[in-house]
Swiss-Prot record:
SUPFAM superfamilies: Ribulose-phoshate binding barrel. Belongs to the OMP decarboxylase family. Type 1 subfamily. Homodimer. This is Orotidine 5'-phosphate decarboxylase.
Length: 241
């Protein structure tokens, strides 16, 4: 594993459960934050203005809206989202290869329209909340999660996407198949002994990086800590070892 010169570049802070004022306060406490993730909660409550605010503060944005619809709708959504200045935009690989290819082209066109660098589209594979049992019982899918993730990552890659989102449990075998330029973004990161909340397939930050994760999505472990700045530094220290 290579030495990590700037570990803060490896951490994407999930701004879930926060409003705009909370976000501003967090960024004041931790000015070293480079990447932030804006998900459904924050985007729906605050709208695109929160993205403009984050860009003004020099933050890189992962717009995690997980688009999943018919191909035309997904493509149009990505066309619009690519004009926000977000570096990463997520969509579900289960939307299918046609939707992913159309979305990728639409994102390039949308960014070009406003003279921005096109974002990398990230394919959501299997959410970290799924367990093997619920996967089989609820969806009637007999494949293992690993098999399914491998297949969906292949769809993402073959569709021209810039990477995918997967749990720490799948990072290692995916990295064996894809170069470092293919982003493997990993949520489900916890510090040892912390509450895993509603996620099931989780791991320690240092281990996820060693296994090949490009970046780690970390939310509540930092944002809900009594000392957010200390926790952020702690995670940076862990992954720089």
């Amino acid at each position: 594993m290579k030495n990590i010169d700037n570990p803060s570049e490896k951490i994407i802070i999930a701004l879930d459960g926060m409003d705009k004022d909370d976000v501003v306060n967090l960024l004041k406490k931790i000015p070293e934050i480079v990447w932030v993730k804006v998900g459904l909660e924050l985007f729906v409550s605050e709208g695109p203005d929160v993205l403009s605010m984050l860009r003004e503060k020099g933050k890189k944005i992962f717009l995690d809206l997980k688009f999943h619809d018919i191909p035309t709708t997904v493509a149009r959504a990505c066309f619009a989202a690519s004009q926000t200045g977000a570096e990463f935009i997520s969509l579900h690989t289960c939307a299918g290869m046609k939707a992913l290819k159309m979305a990728n082209e639409a994102a390039k066109e949308g960014a070009a329209k406003v003279n921005l660098i096109p974002p990398k589209l990230l394919g959501i594979t299997i959410l970290t909340s799924w367990t093997r049992e619920s996967f089989c019982n609820d969806l009637l899918i007999n494949q293992s999660i690993n098999q399914r993730v491998k297949h969906l990552a292949e769809i993402a890659s073959n569709s021209g996407l810039g990477g995918c989102v997967c749990s720490p449990k799948e990072v290692q075998f995916l990295r064996e198949s894809y170069p470092e330029t293919f982003e493997l973004i990993t949520p489900g990161i916890r510090s040892l002994g912390s509450n895993i909340n509603d996620q099931s397939r989780v791991s320690d930050a240092s281990e996820a990086i060693k296994m090949g994760a490009s970046k780690l999505v970390i939310g509540r472990a930092i944002t809900q800590s009594n000392d957010s700045a200390y926790m952020f530094k702690s995670f940076c220290d862990k992954i720089s070892i």
